[in-house]
């Protein structure tokens, strides 16, 4: 049976859920899908379906990013449910990079928690431009004053990280109650709150101006081998357009390779082309699965080149933000997360700078052990021992 063609009749926006573990991110994702499915705007995905990677079952926490799609009257959304647990912040960095806006889930019963702060900070770092807040578990809070207090705390926290806290839409509700209502076939007050949330997302998160006219670039997230068809790489197209038949390069980590695109798919539907913002699978002619890995990029030939040495403008987190407690010195060797990969690199401090304190903002020179596709403006996170200690942006390529 031929695959159904993907229709592009509404503006497309990438969003996702972020927030502290157990505040209800996955339940909210399921509730949105359930409430919208009653209006014919989504396929119903239940909680277990969204929370479905094998590792999660043992620990009861979400690890992999789950993608679901749904529509409102105005838009088509691709929604990622981001991992919440601190151990999996690494995935959050690659997941959050896929969002035009985020729904921050905060339990009204608990208020903002350490990971709430960390996810707001990460959103700032990886360039999530807009946040809408869902104050979950409001059914567990009887005191209206307490709700107001939590709302104030959330607004202050957003403002602290340069998000417009005072203007951010905050909708309170209960994802679990809405999910139960929708499953029972009812449209009650809790489902109405989900519709309020989607209305806020529709109006507050602008339709992104897609970088479709720039040169094609797609960071590789995953690589699959499909028997009889070849190698498929998946990821979100960062900019430009890719068409079936295009000649493209695979850049980073190893020597640059050239290949031809033989297929483009989105949500299991075939397309003639993929464009900036789309989460796609790209079929590559004659490329072996072992020649490609996460962290490489697909790009228009000669448009971006692999580099190992650059200058970057960085901010080093304070210990309160979850960063280092102590300074670091010249030749410090952390991991650099660029797009979808981590590469070890050494930091050279500017002349006259002996050490860097948590909270400092400075220009550094970085030398990576493996080449990565880089250009001015490429963002990266600095991590060590499983936690983010800094964030930065490439200001100048050296080699």
Swiss-Prot record:
What the entry lists under Gene3D superfamilies is as follows: P-loop containing nucleotide triphosphate hydrolases (3.40.50.300), Translation factors (2.40.30.10)
Entry keyword Nucleotide-binding: yes
Plastid recorded as keyword: no
Broad enzyme group:
hydrolase
Residues binding Mg(2+): 26
Q: Where are the transmembrane segments?
A: none
Q: What are the alphabetically sorted keywords of the record? A: Cytoplasm, Elongation factor, GTP-binding, Hydrolase, Magnesium, Metal-binding, Nucleotide-binding, Protein biosynthesis
Which residues are involved in binding GTP?
19-26, 81-85, 136-139
Q: Which InterPro entries match?
A: EF-Tu_GTP-bd (IPR041709), EF-Tu_GTPase (IPR050055), EFTu-like_2 (IPR004161), EFTU_2 (IPR033720), G_TR_CS (IPR031157), P-loop_NTPase (IPR027417), Small_GTP-bd (IPR005225), T_Tr_GTP-bd_dom (IPR000795)
Q: Can you provide one Gene Ontology molecular function annotated for this UniProt record? A: GTP binding
Places the protein is found: Cytoplasm
Instruction: Give a Gene Ontology cellular component term annotated to this protein.
Output: cytosol
Top-level taxon in the UniProt lineage = Bacteria
Q: What is catalysed by this protein? A: GTP + H2O = GDP + phosphate + H(+)
Q: Where is this region: G2?
A: 60-64
Q: Where is this region: G3?
A: 81-84
Give the record's family classification.
Answer: Belongs to the TRAFAC class translation factor GTPase superfamily. Classic translation factor GTPase family. EF-Tu/EF-1A subfamily.
Its function?
A: GTP hydrolase that promotes the GTP-dependent binding of aminoacyl-tRNA to the A-site of ribosomes during protein biosynthesis.
Q: What is this protein called?
A: Elongation factor Tu
Name its species: Campylobacter fetus subsp. fetus (strain 82-40)
């Amino acid at each position: 049976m031929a695959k159904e063609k993907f229709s592009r009749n509404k503006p497309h926006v990438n969003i996702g859920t972020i927030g502290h573990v157990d505040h209800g991110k996955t339940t909210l994702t399921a509730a949105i899908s359930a409430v919208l499915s009653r209006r014919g705007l989504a396929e119903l995905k239940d909680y277990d379906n969204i929370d479905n990677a094998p590792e999660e079952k043992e620990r009861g926490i979400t690890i992999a990013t789950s993608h679901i799609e749904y529509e409102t009257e105005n838009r088509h959304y691709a929604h990622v449910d981001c991992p919440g647990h601190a151990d999996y912040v690494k995935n959050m960095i690659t997941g959050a990079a896929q969002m035009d806006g985020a729904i921050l889930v905060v339990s009204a019963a608990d208020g903002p928690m350490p990971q709430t702060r960390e996810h707001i900070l990460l959103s700032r770092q990886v360039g999530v431009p807009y946040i809408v807040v869902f104050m979950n578990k409001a059914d567990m809070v009887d005191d209206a004053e307490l709700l107001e207090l939590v709302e104030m705390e959330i607004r202050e926290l957003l403002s602290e990280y340069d998000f417009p806290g005072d203007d951010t839409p905050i909708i309170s509700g209960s994802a679990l109650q809405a999910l139960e209502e929708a499953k029972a076939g009812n449209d009650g007050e809790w489902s109405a709150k989900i519709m309020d949330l989607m209305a806020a997302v529709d109006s507050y998160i602008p339709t992104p101006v897609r970088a479709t006219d720039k040169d094609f670039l797609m960071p590789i997230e995953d690589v699959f081998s499909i028997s009889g068809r070849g190698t498929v790489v998946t990821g979100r197209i960062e900019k430009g357009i890719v068409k079936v038949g295009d000649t493209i390069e695979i850049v980073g980590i190893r020597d640059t390779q050239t290949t031809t695109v033989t297929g483009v798919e989105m949500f299991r539907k075939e397309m003639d082309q993929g464009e900036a913002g789309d989460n796609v699978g790209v079929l590559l002619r004659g490329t072996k699965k072992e020649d490609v890995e996460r962290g490489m990029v697909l790009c228009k030939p000669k448009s971006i080149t692999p580099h190992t040495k650059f200058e970057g403008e960085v901010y080093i987190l304070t210990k309160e933000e979850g960063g280092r407690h102590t300074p670091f010195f010249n030749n410090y060797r952390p991991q650099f997360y660029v797009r979808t990969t981590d590469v070890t690199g050494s930091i050279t401090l500017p002349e006259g700078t002996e050490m860097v304190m948590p909270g400092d903002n400075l220009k550094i020179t970085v030398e990576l052990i493996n080449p990565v596709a880089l250009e001015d403006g490429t963002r990266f996170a600095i991590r060590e021992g499983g936690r983010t200690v800094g964030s930065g942006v490439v200001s100048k390529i050296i080699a």
